[in-house]
Amino acid sequence: MLSYTNPVPRMASAVTRFSSIKMVGLCPGIYIVEHQIAHALNRSANQIAIVGAGLNHFGWVLDIRDTTTGDDLYPVFRSAAGRADATWSPLSRALLEHTGYFPYPSDDHVAE
């Protein structure tokens, strides 16, 4: 079974511990951050393509591209994130500034 049910760790643990069902719990965080990045870039999510990698609840956006032109949008996103309201994802923005990459899915998950 593939499950996107939250909370992911508790649901996956319960199913695998108390049943014979083989299950993998997945977080839809990559889709959440895709919408956040698109919003920061004043675009719709279908106008950007992102590549992410990492472990559940601690991934990194490695690439952001314009789906029409193929242009690298990471420099534009870094600039937009630097100008964003201070209350928007402060931990994620600090990690972006420190590492050059934006973590996902959100501050509360990354802080786990």
Identify the residue ranges that each predicted region occupies.
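Internal, well-ordered domain-core segments that constitute the primary functional module
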Residues: 1-64
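Long, compositionally biased stretches enriched for glycine and/or charged residues
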Residues: 40-112
